[in-house]
């Protein structure tokens, strides 16, 4: 049974994994580990289609196109028969933040956060269509793909978007796609795909299930996001900045002083702790 990050990536050490994260280049890991203890087809659908699972974190696609929720939701609840029909017709179900609803994934994410010190999100995709769940795209977090069941072909392009901003719209590349990696993942295999690498994948068997762990390091924009959220709790910070033009100099000085005081109080240890626990900005792909 896989209980933590070290057990998942063995024989690669956690230290070596951390180095690969810093290098920001794709890494293929072949393994025959018992990844089915993390998730299986039934437990995926039980969690993703449950009444407690947030609707905004669930997507249903067919031929790499997202389906409107009206096709599979009624009065706030998922229509399981509609999902079954989509899957029979070559569709996919994508569940973000799935680790919050699957204990084995929750333990793995908690272990990875403790070892790596970053904000980590667990997701999974179940698919039956040869077109894949999504069109070619890049993710805004470093992604560790864990193939759970079935086989999936992954094509990674060589022209990455460098350091994409979390939640920002996708930036299109004008360059013709050049494959950097074209590989087939079987159960137990893993692929570390740094943020910004455009990719697409196709189911190579009757059905496929994979887990994705998104690693989000602390960045300057994230620090500003955390500072802004902290300022929401301060009546003084929320006070309107108003006045005539002849008051601008005094208002600017007061604003600078307020922001500088917050910056001078910054603690990297406290920021890292907040980063791991506070939700990321909306728009996570």
For every predicted segment, state its role:
Residues 1-10, 174-184, 200-285:
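Fe(II)/2-oxoglutarate
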Residues 152-187:
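A short beta-strand-loop-beta hairpin characteristic of the jelly-roll/cupin
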Residues 1-126, 242-247, 256-285:
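Transition-metal
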Residues 126-129, 139-160, 173, 216:
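Short, conserved beta-strand element in jelly-roll/cupin
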Residues 38-39, 134-138, 146, 202:
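Short histidine-centered beta-strand/loop micro-motifs
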Residues 117, 141-142, 161-165, 171, ...:
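A short alpha->loop->secondary-structure connector
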Residues 148, 183-204:
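Conserved metal-binding segment of the jelly-roll/cupin
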């Amino acid at each position: 049974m896989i209980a933590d990050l070290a057990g998942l990536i063995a024989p690669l050490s956690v230290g070596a994994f951390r180095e690969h994260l810093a290098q920001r280049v794709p890494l293929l890991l072949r393994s025959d580990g018992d990844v089915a203890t993390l998730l299986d087809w039934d437990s995926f659908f039980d969690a993703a289609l449950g009444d407690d699972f947030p609707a905004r974190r669930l997507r249903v696609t067919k031929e790499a196109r997202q389906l409107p929720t009206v096709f599979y939701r009624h009065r706030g609840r998922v229509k399981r028969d509609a999902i079954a029909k989509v899957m029979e017709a070559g569709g996919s179900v994508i569940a973000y933040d799935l680790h919050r609803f699957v204990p084995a994934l929750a333990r793995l994410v908690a272990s990875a956060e403790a070892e790596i010190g970053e904000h980590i999100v667990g997701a999974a995709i179940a698919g039956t269509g040869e077109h894949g769940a999504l069109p070619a795209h890049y993710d805004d977090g470093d992604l560790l793909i864990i193939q759970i069941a079935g086989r999936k072909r992954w094509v990674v392009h060589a022209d990455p978007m460098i350091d994409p901003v979390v939640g920002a719209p996708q930036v299109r590349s004008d360059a013709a796609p050049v494959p950097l990696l074209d590989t087939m993942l079987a159960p137990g295999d893993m692929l570390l795909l740094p943020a910004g690498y455009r990719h697409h994948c196709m189911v190579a068997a009757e059905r496929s299930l994979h887990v994705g762990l998104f690693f989000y390091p602390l960045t300057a924009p994230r620090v500003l996001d955390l500072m802004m959220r902290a300022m929401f709790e301060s009546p003084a910070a929320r006070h309107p900045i108003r006045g005539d033009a002849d008051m601008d100099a005094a208002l600017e000085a007061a604003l600078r002083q307020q922001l500088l005081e917050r910056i001078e109080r910054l603690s990297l240890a406290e920021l890292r702790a907040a980063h791991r626990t506070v939700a990321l900005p909306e728009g996570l792909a």
